[in-house]
Amino acid sequence: MEEYETDIKQILGTVDRQTVSAKQVRQLLEERRKVDLSAHKKDLNALILKCFDETAAPSEKESLEKQAPARKTKGKRATENGTEEGKKPAKRTRKRKEDGEEGGKRKRNQDPANNPLNKPMKLSPKLAEFLGLEQLSRPQTVKKLWEYIKAHDLQDPNDKRTILCDDKLKSVFEVDTLHMFTMNKYLTNLMTKIPDDQLPKPQPKNEEPAAPNDLPKQEEKELVEPPTAESTA
């Protein structure tokens, strides 16, 4: 699984870390590598959490260290032995190289029109009532939930990844607490796929001015041939 570590860290650098789930990261990794990794779900989830911890911002790291002192001690010991410090430059070099090789592929993966996660889904009656909408994509749904969570200060002060549900959230999820990595698991039962033929059609892009090859035959001829005496008589 270690061969996917660089890809996972790059993916975590392009998503909203407060709303993304391990499942979403795994799906994006499968799209990037063009492989089916469902058989390695457990190992991949552990690697995703490891990469999430290693790339956390200082405020995130402080919270993570409170929850996992054993992991912190292990990392410190590796640094003192020189192992961790010796590996870091190689990882940065490899990351820069792969950035150049896979830059085009990453851009394609980020195209919203080609991302299945951005398709609208039908919300359950309770979720629709809570959000005031009947259809939303999964990322939009998670974003609105986090807007509500932050507006009402529902994050556990000891671990910002844990949400302390108020009465409204309890009525939707039917639990007292949620974890940021399990929120999408609950949403799976509250959102239904919409058949492709029932999805709203994308808005057409602004049409560009017609090129000379697109002009009518007579106009095109006038562009390349000067008028003759007969045509001007």
From Swiss-Prot:
Tell me the segments the record calls region Disordered: 55-122, 194-233
GO CC list: cytosol; nucleus; RNA polymerase I upstream activating factor complex
Q: What keywords are assigned to this protein?
A: Cytoplasm, Nucleus, Transcription, Transcription regulation
* GO molecular function ontology, one term from the record: RNA polymerase I cis-regulatory region sequence-specific DNA binding
Its GO biological process annotations read: nucleolar large rRNA transcription by RNA polymerase I; transcription initiation at RNA polymerase I promoter
This protein's record includes keyword Nucleus: yes
**Where this protein primarily resides, as one coarse class?**
cytoplasm
Q: Where is the DEK-C domain?
A: 1-53
Subunit (UniProt) = Component of the UAF (upstream activation factor) complex which consists of spp27/uaf30, rrn5, rrn10, and histones H3 and H4. Interacts with rrn10.
This protein is called Upstream activation factor subunit spp27
The record ties this protein, via SUPFAM superfamilies, to:
DEK C-terminal domain (SSF109715), SWIB/MDM2 domain (SSF47592)
Q: Does the keyword Transcription apply?
A: yes
Query: According to the UniProt entry, which residue ranges have a biased composition of type Basic and acidic residues?
Result: 194-208
Highest taxon in the source lineage = Eukaryota
Instruction: Name the InterPro entries on file.
Output: DEK_C, SWIB_domain, SWIB_MDM2_dom_sf, SWIB_MDM2_domain
Domain SWIB/MDM2 intervals: 116-193
| Record's function text | Component of the UAF (upstream activation factor) complex which interacts with the upstream element of the RNA polymerase I promoter and forms a stable preinitiation complex. UAF seems to stimulate basal transcription to a fully activated level.
Which organism is this entry from? Schizosaccharomyces pombe (strain 972 / ATCC 24843)
Q: What is its subcellular localisation?
A: Cytoplasm; Nucleus
